[in-house]
Amino acid sequence: MEGRYLVLSDVHCREWVAESARALMDQHGLHEVVLLGDITHFGPPQFAEDFIKALGAKCYAVPGNCDPPGTLTFIESSAISLHGRKVVVNGRTWGGLGGSNPSIFRTPSEMPEEEIFRSLSPVMERGMVLVLHCPAHGTFDTPFSNKHVGSTAVRDLIRRTEPLVVLSGHIHEDRGVAQKEGVWYMNPGAAKDRYAGMMELGEEVKLTLLDLEV
């Protein structure tokens, strides 16, 4: 079996999430965490390191659009950063990208679609685990406006490369699990809203939505 992982996104500086996540890890026998960004809420960047250390587990992470640029340094000091890079985890390539495409909110870590494409292209491999903050356009990317706001660059790269699993957050309102054209997708929901997920990789992929206890 490749591994079992707690998946968290959109903590937005809620300190209580770390304790609740530890309890969930104990309950499900999990020892590693995937963080999908927006660990802070427009800072302070140091919170990312403090939060990751409070989890007490090995972490793989990308920053979110609400994480100021300096946050990446603190992620790199306390977790395995997947922002614009890839690593091999239990024999499978994992890679990712943080931040998001442009939004109406003009948050600190947004980038144009062209930059997303350039940054993510070297990371992509068929059959990989893709760890993102921003979702692909058309998949778990619909806020209350009911308009798709995900990245077209991410969507196009997924279609071209066919990863095994795509994990993303960012859109708090569009939580779920789906399989489309052979690719598994999960948005675990916002941890600040007491939501989480679990990824199990082995002979089969199993993605499960979980709830955090306050």
Question: Residue ranges of each PLM-predicted region?
Answer:
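Active-site-proximal beta-strand elements of phosphoester/diester hydrolases
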Residues: 2-12, 91-100, 129-133, 185-189, ...
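Core catalytic region of metal-dependent phosphoesterases/phosphodiesterases
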Residues: 4, 8-89
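Active-site environment of divalent metal-dependent phosphoester hydrolases
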Residues: 12-17, 40-46, 65-72, 88, ...
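Active-site charged/polar residues at nucleotide-handling catalytic sites that mediate phosphoryl
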Residues: 28, 125, 161
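Conserved beta-sheet core of the metallophosphoesterase superfamily
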Residues: 60, 142-203
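Conserved hydrophobic/aromatic beta-strand scaffold that supports enzyme active sites
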Residues: 86, 96, 131, 177, ...
